[in-house]
Design a protein with these regions (language model features):
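Bacterial Sec-dependent N-terminal signal peptides
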Residues: 1-28
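Active-site glycine-centered loops adjacent to acidic/histidine catalytic or metal-binding residues
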Residues: 71, 387, 462
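Sec-dependent signal peptide cleavage junction
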Residues: 22-43, 380, 535-557
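Extracellular S/T/G-rich loop segment that most often corresponds to the catalytic His/Ser-adjacent loop
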Residues: 380, 401-479, 483, 487, ...
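Mature extracellular/periplasmic domains of secretome proteins
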Residues: 52-61, 290-293, 314-317, 332-354, ...
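A cross-family glycoside hydrolase active-site/sugar-binding cleft signature
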Residues: 326, 354-358, 385-386, 416-417, ...
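Subtilisin-like serine protease catalytic core
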Residues: 53-67, 74-274, 278-334, 408-411, ...
């Protein structure tokens, strides 16, 4: 068993997992807490039913809205998602022909930009920091820049070098070694607990209720549950917890390997396109499930899982179609794939795009920026997760973002994650923040939604979950007020956010601050207030203008 010192380390490291893996649903928090009304229930939700009641009382007509989810893949066979999937009516399923001549064969429900024509799919990928570092290493290692252009590239090289190499004090290797030891000990304890509980899969709560009969059982139970409590909570299963630890260890190994070895060309070995040519767009396949659908399936369900069917949980919006676009691997996404995914969504009629991904390097940022501009020109709102590093994104990097070299996007909203007092606090401990660059906070802790692999459901946490909450509210607004522009829709979400007078935790410093100190609006999103604000905007006689360019100069490109 793990000795006392290692147990302390294990608990600390397990706590680190909270930023990367699942959060367990705590018993005292309802599964749908994020949708509840704060005034009547005491939970810091978005007053969703109150919004529906208002729409009903006003006899508002609902028009179907198309939301694209750019993510890791979606379980298109899930009982709560299959009925709401977008269907490309111009494409004949399974005939192997590009019927609509858009360059993508059999894109019936969407497209997979990280797949090959031979049916293979990109599952894992390297980190962008490593890709940038090794691309520029030969050019700049041991050299000094002269021109302004060279100095900018050199600065990016040094930033990537610091990210990849760091202090290189051996701490990463020792952490990995310890985690592998912890994994071995956890598996031993798990084997014993499986035996005494009489089942292969059990929750922490079930293990907690078991009365041990031997000292060995007592030690195994104490060690396993002690770490599990700090690594997600006792509602998760033994397999979910151990798998999360294994995945986290693997991510650290990938980062450690990058210190000495160039990244593997995971993507180009499968997709077959010219990665450096944005115009080479006709690549990928139509496999939307692929091998990494957990994240995307959960996000899609948050937005639009079939409501009121008494299965699992209800989505935010009840008249939405989901367009599935796979562009995010286990690792960092490529700018080309994100740019093409945005353009695909826009060209096929998406009105809102949910983007629960991000990275701290973007070597082809102009490709993504141009795609965001293109979306603006077609009146499409983009909703983006702020990230899970508990960092201030006013002073650090999180891409994509609305900051362009020559201005600022007006059709992109950035979302931080909120919680509940009964669930760890009003702000999520992992959420990125920023007085200038995070627009609003939305529920992102223990969000119950769809999971892949046979009509499953469960809780996950992250700004990745807060993002589709906002996308779902935006879709609900557009259902009832379809003439709203993307800019107006962004205004509705932001201006209707409920400003918090209560001090909250700064996710990074843990200081008590006002929400307005760590976000632009200082507010939590609220569907009911948003619907009221949308009504005001729709009743104005101000001409609708869709901005095609940027109106405010940004501070970093």
């Amino acid at each position: 068993m793990i000795n006392k010192m290692n147990k302390i380390k294990a608990i600390a490291l397990a706590s680190m997992l909270l930023s990367f893996t699942t959060f367990a649903q705590k018993a005292e928090v309802p599964k749908n807490w994020h949708q509840l009304d704060p005034a009547s229930t005491g939970y810091n939700g978005v007053s969703l039913q109150k919004a529906y009641d208002l729409a009903k009382s006003k006899k508002l007509k609902s028009k179907r809205v198309l939301v694209a989810v750019i993510d890791s893949g979606i379980d298109t066979a899930h009982e709560d998602l299959k009925p709401i999937l977008w269907v490309n009516k111009k494409e004949i399923p399974g005939n192997g022909i590009d019927d609509d001549k858009n360059g993508y064969i059999d894109d019936v429900n969407g497209w997979n930009f990280i797949g090959g024509k031979d049916g293979r799919n990109v599952k894992e990928d390297s980190y962008e920091s490593a890709r940038v570092y090794y691309k520029l290493k030969t050019k700049w290692e041991g050299k000094e820049p002269i021109t302004l252009e060279e100095k900018a590239e050199y600065a990016e090289f040094k930033r990537a070098q610091k990210s990849v190499i760091g202090d290189d004090d051996g701490g990463g290797a020792s952490t990995i070694l310890f985690l592998k030891q912890a994994e071995t000990n956890l598996k031993k304890a798990d084997t014993l607990l499986q035996k005494v509980l009489g089942k292969e899969t059990y929750t922490g709560k079930e293990a907690e209720a078991y009365e041990t009969k031997t000292n060995e059982e007592k030690k195994a139970k104490g060690m396993f549950l002690g770490i599990m409590k700090n690594g997600g909570g006792l509602e998760q299963t033994n397999k979910e917890f151990i798998d999360g630890l294994i995945e986290y260890t693997a991510s650290l190994e990938k980062k450690e390997d990058a210190k000495n070895n160039p990244p593997v060309a995971y993507r180009s070995n499968i997709t077959g396109d010219d990665e450096n040519n944005l115009n080479d767009r006709n690549y990928g396949n139509n496999d939307l499930l692929a091998s990494t659908p957990m994240h995307g399936t959960h996000c899609a369900g948050i937005i639009a899982a079939v409501r009121n069917n008494k299965k699992g949980g209800d989505g935010m919006a009840d008249n939405v179609s989901i367009m599935a676009i796979r562009a995010v691997p286990d690792g960092d996404e490529h700018d080309k794939d994100i740019a093409n995914a945005i353009r695909y969504a826009v060209d096929n009629g998406a009105q809102i795009i949910s983007m629960s991904f991000g990275k701290d390097f973007s070597p082809e940022k102009e490709w993504v920026d141009d795609a965001i501009r293109y979306a603006a020109s077609k009146n499409v709102l983009l909703v983006h997760a702020a990230g899970n590093d508990a960092k201030n994104v006013d002073t650090t990097y999180n891409f994509p973002n609305p900051i362009f070299k020559n201005g600022r996007a007006t059709n992109l909203i950035t979302v931080g994650a909120s919680g509940d007092k009964k669930n760890g606090g009003l702000t999520a401990s992992f959420s990125n923040y920023g007085k200038n660059e995070v627009d609003v906070f939305a529920p992102g802790v223990n969000i119950f939604s769809t999971l892949p692999g046979g009509d499953k459901y469960g809780p996950l946490s992250g700004t990745s979950m807060a993002c589709p909450v906002v996308a779902g509210i935006a879709a609900l607004m557009l259902q009832y007020y379809p003439n709203l522009t993307a800019v107006q829709l962004k205004e509705v979400i932001e201006k209707s956010a409920v400003v918090s007078k209560e001090k909250v935790n700064n996710p990074e410093t843990k200081e008590k601050v006002l929400l307005s100190d760590i976000s632009k609006t200082g507010g939590f999103v609220n569907a009911y207030e948003a619907l009221k604000y949308a009504a005001k905007i729709s009743e104005t006689k101000t001409p609708i203008v869709v901005p095609r360019t940027i109106i405010k100069k940004g501070k970093k490109g």
